[in-house]
């Protein structure tokens, strides 16, 4: 799809202007672009034996959602907490934890400085609750695109490489796919000016059908549109699951990030619902060498312990798989 339909074609300046007003567009554009060029790089620990690791490990903010929603952890302290508690050097934000601050550059500057203070790199922002990019009504899709624009600028300001979006929508599978693809193309036209990718996660509904999502990405036909494969989000509807290993394999050709979803662990430290070794082989065989994000969602272990268990598993398998290559 080289040219999106007229309903979504005027996306770059005109949609920004309608969403933010001329002054808002100028402020967001200058702040986001300048930050994208000057964002601080986080220090990474030297790999054991002087070898480059097969992948870095990052932490998705959702892993600590109970602590954050419960008031035990402030979103601004997430970078410090990540470094001091887990020794990790990259984070993935969720907009739900600072939804009122997407265009608040005082807040974002504070968050960015805290990342710099603790040697933390900002990877991406996961965007939820900003409208259905695959809606049947083009006006609804346009509004959803507009609501995502501030997060593109915020991501650039923080030094991220991407935003993660959802492909929820309506219609037949074919209609839904085409509608979502149009919105993704429109968002990517803006995102490329900020050095950002627009990534779709398998996140329930049709997006958890790996074949459907892969085809939607192909239809979007933009180098800045990609995927964020999640190891566990393959429930299409109640009682209907897509094969998670097939799904990740289908999404990896477009991947710019990967989410290692975990829930529980056995006595040997292996995840009980997903064969992480098999998943990591799929990821690595696709040629991916970017960060893999911990996203713990379990209930038996407290969040901090669940993150640590996931981290230990990823580190162990990283060494095992590196030795076999």
Positions of predicted regions on the chain:
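Glycine-rich, proline-tolerant flexible connector loops at the mouths of alpha/beta enzymes
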Residues: 92-111, 170-171
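Short catalytic-loop micro-motif centered on adjacent basic/acidic residues
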Residues: 92-93, 198-203, 267
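Metal-dependent catalytic neighborhoods of phosphoester/phosphodiester hydrolases
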Residues: 101-109, 138, 175, 303-306
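Conserved beta-strand positions in the central sheet of alpha/beta enzyme cores
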Residues: 90-92, 124, 164, 259, ...
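Short acidic/polar active-site loop segments enriched in Thr and Asp
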Residues: 89, 121, 161, 289-290
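Catalytic-core regions built around general acid/base machinery
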Residues: 107-117, 183-187, 247, 279-282
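Active-site acidic/histidine proton-transfer and metal-coordination neighborhood
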Residues: 19-30, 42-52, 80, 114-229, ...
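Histidine-acidic metal/acid-base catalytic patches
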Residues: 2-87, 207-325
């Amino acid at each position: 799809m080289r040219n999106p339909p007229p309903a979504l074609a005027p996306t770059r300046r005109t949609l920004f202007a309608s969403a933010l007003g001329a002054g808002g567009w100028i402020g967001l554009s200058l702040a986001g672009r300048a930050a994208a060029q000057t964002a601080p790089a986080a220090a990474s620990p030297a790999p054991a034996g002087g070898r480059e690791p097969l992948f870095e490990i990052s932490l998705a903010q959702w892993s600590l959602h109970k602590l954050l929603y419960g008031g035990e952890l402030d979103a601004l302290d997430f970078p410090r907490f990540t470094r001091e508690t887990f020794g990790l050097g990259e984070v993935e934000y969720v907009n739900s934890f600072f939804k009122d601050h997407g265009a608040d550059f005082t807040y974002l500057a504070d968050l960015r400085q805290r990342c710099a203070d603790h040697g933390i790199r900002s990877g991406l922002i996961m965007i939820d609750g900003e409208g259905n990019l695959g809606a049947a009504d083009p006006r609804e899709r346009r509004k959803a695109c507009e609501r995502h624009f501030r997060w593109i600028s915020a991501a650039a300001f923080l030094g991220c490489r991407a935003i993660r979006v959802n492909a929820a929508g309506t219609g037949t599978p074919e209609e839904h796919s085409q509608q979502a693809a149009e919105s993704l193309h429109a968002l990517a036209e803006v995102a490329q000016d900020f050095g950002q990718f627009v990534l779709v996660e398998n996140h329930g509904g049709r997006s958890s059908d790996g074949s459907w999502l892969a085809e939607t990405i192909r239809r979007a036909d933009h180098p800045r549109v990609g995927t964020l494969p999640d190891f566990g989000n393959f429930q299409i509807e109640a009682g209907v699951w897509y094969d998670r290993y097939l799904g990740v394999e289908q999404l990896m050709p477009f991947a710019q990030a990967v989410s290692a979803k975990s829930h529980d662990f056995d006595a040997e430290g292996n995840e009980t619902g997903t064969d992480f070794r098999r998943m990591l082989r799929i990821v690595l065989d696709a040629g991916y060498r970017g960060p893999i994000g911990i996203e713990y969602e379990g209930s038996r272990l407290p969040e901090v312990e669940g993150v640590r268990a996931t981290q230990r598993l990823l580190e162990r398998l990283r060494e095992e798989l590196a030795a076999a290559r």
